[in-house]
Amino acid sequence: MRADAQRNYAKLLSAASAAFTESGADDASLEEIARRAGVGIGTLYRHFPTRQALLEAVYRDQAEQLRARADELLASGEPGEAFASWLRALVAFSSTKRSLTSAMVATLGKDSEVMSTCSKLIKDSANALLARAQEAGAVRADVNSTDLIRLVHGVSMVTEYAPGDPGQADRMLTLILDGLRPQPAG
């Protein structure tokens, strides 16, 4: 892909991600996405022939960003802090991408290739960070990544259905993290 085409692709993904977050995956205008990206609608359709293709690309891009964040955190930092930082990133992803995820599942089904690939990226990242945190004694040994991901989805659902408290997700995640720490013997 030419350099200008790559830049346009990246700008379209960024604009679409913002529009889907603000307006919902079904209601965001493709013309508005193209305008925000600073390209014509024809450029949008050359990269993404359908709304579904754009949805898939945005979802995959966001999952890859979570994986990249996990890789950064695995390479540096204290294991417990790295684990908590990534869970906060996962809460943000889950909270802002709920309509996108719902649209993907409704259109493709939860077992589609793109959903499976993205779920695997997220779960593999969670497994790696969790194992490192458990080895360091920062997280209880009986915790698994499936439960963690479900807890995060629960936090995002609560914050979606009870808006108006911007600190709620962080407080809930702090409670979860406190519960994940090993308890003193006694």
Model-derived regions: residue spans:
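Base-recognition residues in the alpha-helical recognition helix of bacterial helix-turn-helix
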Residues: T21, R46-P49, D61
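Short linear capping/connector segments at secondary-structure termini
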Residues: S102-D111
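Short hydrophobic/aromatic patch on the recognition helix
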Residues: G38-F48
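Hydrophobic/aromatic residues within well-ordered alpha-helical segments
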Residues: N8, V58, Q62, L66, ...
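Hydrophobic alpha-helical connector segments
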Residues: A57, A68-T96, K110-V114
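Basic, helix-initiating cap at the start of DNA-binding domains
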Residues: M1-S23, D27-R36, A53-E56
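C-terminal peripheral helix-coil segments that are non-catalytic and often amphipathic
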Residues: D124-V139, Y161-G186
